[in-house]
Amino acid sequence: KKADKQFSRLEFVKASESYKKLIDKGNSSDYIVGQLAECYYNIFNTVEAEKWYATLAEDSTDPDIIFKYSQMLKANGKYKLSNKWMSKFVELRPADNRSTAFMKDPNYLPKIISKGKRFNVQNLDINSEYSDFGGTLNNNKLYITSSRNTVGLFDIGRWITQRISYGWNNEPYLDVYSFDVSESGSYINEDYLDSNINTKYHEGLASFDANGNMYLTRESFYENEYVEDPESNNITSLLGIYKISVGDKNVVGLNINSVEYSVKNPSLSSDGKTLYFSSDMPGGFGNFDIYRGDIDEKGDINNVENLGQKINT
């Protein structure tokens, strides 16, 4: 019960520890092993996820287990074995979009790897031991999303809150940082953005229009909005997209935000007339799909449309 409660609260690190203790005590039912594998899958511990999915996959006819096992094998570089299990997934779910895509070109991975040899990938020295991602350039600055802030919220020249960890992965909540781009192309002068942008909850994945206005994702806890799960009685935040105006830094939620579903990960077209974003709104093809919408003169998003099954699975 303890492990299941932690899992239902999306506290996957704690839940994995609890399920592992049960297994160590001899309770290695398929349910517990499956829950442990799912925990590792959700925090992207690919080695442990592969290990525990492997104990289930051989005798399983559950397409979800087979698919996730294949994905973890692929993530760990075991491409031939991954393809073997994807073929089994195809047998179980031949009409699934993932099966159709795989069967069109089952040996696509060597092609991708071959193309990758044309590029030089470097690990930047601005990376931390925490999650760092979502880099975007604007006005000679690099903006990233990071969970490196272990101290608190900075405001009025001082740190004013104790930082808490996010139960999903036991890392601090995400914030937005900026770096200056030097003449040599390196990134210097790390800056934690102020409290009208960063709150004690998640913010991230900044994008900019031609006027320098920032669009980013923020948790709805910021506006005291949440969803209550009737089964677990947990409260869960939604995600929304907010626009921070250049100059007065006024923060406004976009008209596509909803109390029924999340919208997140904004990205603007080069002409600033189209917003691309992801959402789990009804009518999609999967969990979160990618959508586009037109930005009008008032900044509202209109004519929202799903990008279709060639993009969304």
Label every PLM stretch briefly.
Residues 35, 68-69, 102:
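Canonical tetratricopeptide repeat
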Residues 1-21, 25:
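Alpha-helical segment of the N-proximal tetratricopeptide repeat
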Residues 75, 79, 91-313:
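Short, conserved micro-motifs composed of acidic
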